[in-house]
Amino acid sequence: SSLSVLVLSLSFAYCLSAPVPQDEDSELTPGDLQLAEHYLNRLYSSSSNPVGMLRMKNVNSIETKLKEMQSFFGLEVTGKLNEDTLDIMKQPRCGVPDVGQYNFFPRKLKWPRNNLTYRIVNYTPDLSTSEVDRAIKKALKVWSDVTPLNFTRLRTGTADIMVSFGKKEHGDYYPFDGPDGLLAHAFPPGEKLGGDTHFDDDEMFSTDNKGYNLFVVAAHEFGHALGLDHSRDPGSLMFPVYTYTETSRFVLPDDDVQGIQVLYGPGNRDPHPKHPKTPEKCDPDLSIDAITELRGEKMIFKDRFFWRVHPQMTDAELVLIKSFWPELPNKLDAAYEHPAKDLSYLFRGKKFWALNGYDIVEDYPKKLHELGFPKTLKAIDAAVYNKDTGKTFFFTEDSYWSFDEEARTLDKGFPRLISEDFPGIGEKVDAAYQRNGYLYFFNGALQFEYSIWSQRITRILKTNFVLMC
């Protein structure tokens, strides 16, 4: 068949064989280099391409492929393998290539009709058949909610989207790689394999945050089956790296809505008129939810995300909260660090968590009232620890409390009004942190630099100044 000829031709295609260039400061093992070579050969080389267009001429060098990969993920583009690049390569992900020229098809494809069929060919032993059925149906509904598309299930015969579970070589000349690594792949709209969606049955699929959530993986893959490429937006469902998200309240991100509606247009049954957008760090109107330092690194929280700002970094890195801590909620209210204890505290609603480094401490979350707050208190707006006094200020609405970290009790005489003790910063605080004898209070798009010793505002800055804007 023509597919067999194509696959035979691919066996003679270029394969990475030159050594992978590496950063001199990185301590990489031979296994790391082998992983990187395999990753680039699989996801950034046309020789890995099971279907579509062959590109035998002007095959890019390994250094160029590394640069492409680093650029796609927003890393520092060096063309050399380093720890940050390797960390991305080690994360579980979709098996579809990231860059268009290496993708299954050379141009945008879409289904020529809005009424599509799907069939679940077989099942994973990890879940009951009803759990798989529900996850697949819900994953397709993510896309039909925002488009005119309709999906009808077939029990027999050939459907537009054939859903199956398989291991290693599973019939499409694009084998899976065992546990972790590549979780699934899907083919864009078209005949034969077009639309078909395959899941690696060496993975442990689940309906929660254990293993890999089938709904999350399937919703991503169906994006490919409908014609979408990977997105560079880390908040997008079509970002190639797997991140668990709460499925009960899942709303398709705006980036994905925009992409799918370019292909099929909007629908008229969207239950979520507002779709979450990825924050822009240099937005002049940017406000933040929380800020803290963690072992010298600033962590600035906004919606589902946080920015990492390290003294040695030239730019802020945007990361999903769930990609670091699947156990945490999608949004935080407040955060602060107690450096002497090597602990950071994160707050949401009436609960709070403690971090030692990046690890959540056992026996957390705990309740706010365990710190002495009244049980009627619903949330903390901001928190900041003053290392000179050993006190932590907790801000809520127009008031604040003082907490003695040594005694682990609230100080008497509180709460007090923010406007009386910190005049000029406004009647509420969104976030706060301390640095070099100053408290920094964030209120909407502004931050106020407040001298602890003179007890006055010394500078007013834009909130995005903390993100090097």
Curated annotation (Swiss-Prot):
Cofactor(s) required for function per UniProt: Ca(2+); Zn(2+)
Positions with a binding annotation for Zn(2+) 1: 170, 172, 185, 198
Active site: 221
Ligand binding (Ca(2+) 2): 160, 194, 196
The keyword Ubl conjugation appears for this protein: no
Motif (Cysteine switch): 92-99
GO molecular function, one term: metalloendopeptidase activity
Chain residues that bind Ca(2+) 5: 291, 335, 383
PTM text: The proenzyme is activated by removal of the propeptide; this cleavage can be effected by other matrix metalloproteinases and may involve several cleavage steps. Cleavage can also be autocatalytic, after partial maturation by another protease or after treatment with 4-aminophenylmercuric acetate (APMA) (in vitro).
Binding site for Ca(2+) 1: 126, 201, 203
Function as written in the Swiss-Prot or TrEMBL entry: Plays a role in the degradation of extracellular matrix proteins including fibrillar collagen, fibronectin, TNC and ACAN. Cleaves several types of triple helical collagen. May also function by activating or degrading key regulatory proteins. Plays a role in wound healing, tissue remodeling, cartilage degradation, bone development, bone mineralization and ossification.
Domain notes: The C-terminal region binds to collagen. The conserved cysteine present in the cysteine-switch motif binds the catalytic zinc ion, thus inhibiting the enzyme. The dissociation of the cysteine from the zinc ion upon the activation-peptide release activates the enzyme.
Protein name: Collagenase 3
